[in-house]
Design a protein with these regions (language model features):
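Cleavable N-terminal export/targeting peptides
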Residues: 1-31
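Subset of outer-membrane beta-barrel
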Residues: 19-342
Length: 342
């Protein structure tokens, strides 16, 4: 049975790699809504080039692969904040706890917001005196459970909402994932499907207007109230499949690699590569490279550090992480995250 699972996984991975050579003429970029759902959550995952589907094991697993939540013990809290691209702010927070005999549950919040800007019109290009902003938000509940010593499953359900000024839209989405520790020592396989849900469209009082239904005919009705209708767009569906494992696995030194193949519905297929070195189970050095094989990719090298330290000689730990990721012409993104394990 295990050999069949491994063979099937290798077949799926090989098929994903083959897609890198096919269907490269149409990328479908810009054809989905709620693009913030693709922003990598967690300093560790971002530092490792977003190669995390097989090796995730902390609260950010609710983003990468909810099956990874099954590795959590006790109670954990995680938060991160960073200035994202083009002056926007990105925030992610999560709370999780292990329910013995049932599974691990988590609640997560993701927010992407823009600063205030002037409302401009054709008649008033310098501003009307009003200001607007935009905000994307996702609230999700996740569960992960180990079915055996080797196989873990997980799922998430989340409410996805987008707003710009007085117009907004929302929908529901689900994520599912699996992780499998192979009989091959220190090798883990993982796969997940993220953002499977209904299409999303915007509506609100910004869409309201008054029009003359027949401007060429003078009559008693000069203007009637009308409403713009916006098209509905699909969510950014992601299929990830990956492999990870320990190159070195000793008491005081651990070197971990990760490779993910990603098939999105709004871009070309690509690979993510990541590497992590952990010293004394306290200090980590990370590096990664995302977007390999993606045409016109702007992502570059990402680097990161992590510190996991006991609190006052107890089993509780404090986790502090830092990541610097290169986004080419859009600049460098720096991220700091903080976690507590009880």
């Amino acid at each position: 049975m295990m050999k069949r699972i491994i063979a099937l996984f290798i077949f799926v991975l090989s098929f994903s790699m083959a897609q890198l050579e096919n269907d490269q003429d149409i990328s479908k970029v810009g054809t989905t809504a709620a693009h913030f759902l693709k922003i990598s959550s967690g300093s560790r995952g971002l530092a490792m080039g977003s190669a995390n589907v097989a090796i995730c094991s902390d609260l950010t697993s609710s983003f990468w692969n909810p099956a990874g939540l099954s590795h959590l013990k006790g109670i954990q809290v995680y938060f991160e904040n960073n200035g994202w691209l083009a002056g926007t702010d990105y925030n992610y927070g999560s709370f999780g706890f292990a329910w013995p005999g049932v599974g691990v549950f988590s609640l997560s919040l993701t927010m992407l917001s823009s600063p205030d800007d002037l409302v401009r019109t054709v008649e008033q290009p310098n501003g009307t005196g009003e200001k607007f902003n935009a905000q994307d938000m996702s609230i999700g509940i996740s569960v992960g459970k180990s079915l055996t010593d080797q196989l873990s499953l997980g799922a998430s359900i989340k409410n996805v909402r987008q707003r710009i000024w007085h117009s907004s839209g929302q929908t529901l989405a689900i994520d599912i994932g699996v992780q499998y520790e192979t009989p091959i020592k220190d090798i883990i396989l993982g796969a997940s499907i993220a953002n499977f849900g209904n299409d999303l469209s915007l509506a609100g009082r910004d869409m309201s207007l008054s029009v003359d239904p027949d401007p060429n005919n003078q009559g008693n009705i000069e203007f009637v109230n009308a409403q713009y209708e916006t098209d509905a767009f699909p969510l950014p569906l992601l299929f990830r499949v990956g492999i990870g494992g320990h190159i070195i696995n000793k008491e005081n030194l651990n070197v971990l690699f990760a490779i993910d193949a990603v098939h999105p519905n709004d871009n070309y297929e690509y690979l993510n590569l990541g590497l992590e070195t952990n010293i004394n189970k306290i200090f980590s050095i990370r590096a990664g490279y995302p977007g390999i094989g993606k045409k016109d990719a702007i992502e570059g090298l990402s680097l990161g550090l992590g510190l996991k330290y006991p609190i006052m000689n107890t089993s509780n730990t404090l986790v502090v992480e830092y990541t610097s990721a290169d986004f080419g012409p859009l600049g460098i993104v720096q991220r700091v995250s903080l976690g507590f394990n009880y």
